[in-house]
From Swiss-Prot:
<dbReference type="InterPro" id="IPR023739">
    <property type="entry name" value="HcaC"/>
</dbReference>
<protein>
    <recommendedName>
        <fullName>3-phenylpropionate/cinnamic acid dioxygenase ferredoxin subunit</fullName>
    </recommendedName>
</protein>
<keyword id="KW-0001">2Fe-2S</keyword>
<feature type="binding site">
    <location>
        <position position="42"/>
    </location>
    <ligand>
        <name>[2Fe-2S] cluster</name>
    </ligand>
</feature>
<keyword id="KW-0813">Transport</keyword>
<comment type="similarity">
    <text>Belongs to the bacterial ring-hydroxylating dioxygenase ferredoxin component family.</text>
</comment>
<keyword id="KW-0408">Iron</keyword>
<feature type="domain" description="Rieske">
    <location>
        <begin position="4"/>
        <end position="99"/>
    </location>
</feature>
<feature type="binding site">
    <location>
        <position position="65"/>
    </location>
    <ligand>
        <name>[2Fe-2S] cluster</name>
    </ligand>
</feature>
<dbReference type="InterPro" id="IPR017941">
    <property type="entry name" value="Rieske_2Fe-2S"/>
</dbReference>
<dbReference type="GO" id="GO:0051537">
    <property type="term" value="F:2 iron, 2 sulfur cluster binding"/>
</dbReference>
<dbReference type="InterPro" id="IPR036922">
    <property type="entry name" value="Rieske_2Fe-2S_sf"/>
</dbReference>
<feature type="binding site">
    <location>
        <position position="62"/>
    </location>
    <ligand>
        <name>[2Fe-2S] cluster</name>
    </ligand>
</feature>
<keyword id="KW-0411">Iron-sulfur</keyword>
<dbReference type="InterPro" id="IPR053387">
    <property type="entry name" value="Ring-hydroxylating_fd"/>
</dbReference>
<dbReference type="GO" id="GO:0008695">
    <property type="term" value="F:3-phenylpropionate dioxygenase activity"/>
</dbReference>
<comment type="function">
    <text>Part of the multicomponent 3-phenylpropionate dioxygenase, that converts 3-phenylpropionic acid (PP) and cinnamic acid (CI) into 3-phenylpropionate-dihydrodiol (PP-dihydrodiol) and cinnamic acid-dihydrodiol (CI-dihydrodiol), respectively. This protein seems to be a 2Fe-2S ferredoxin.</text>
</comment>
Amino acid sequence: MNRIYACPVADVPEGEALRIDTSPVIALFNVGGEFYAINDRCSHGNASMSEGYLEDDATVECPLHAASFCLKTGKALCLPATDPLTTYPVHVEGSDIFIDLPEAQP
């Protein structure tokens, strides 16, 4: 895994999301003080998940077609999406957030 610096904790208030412009682009969410990172592109359509609707139960709804995903597992919870989103491990160290990304393939 390749650990990257994402942002300060203060940049992602509770109940909010932040787009992290990495490769791949990541959507970082704060749900009740727990941070979750997923691929920012909906698996059904070309929509930014960081612009989606965050629910208290750690799910996010795509802003384009209302597909819902579990932030913990990436699982698609309702149609029209059937494919999961990639999730990434998140680490909080002091006041900073880091995300583990897979190593780049040669």
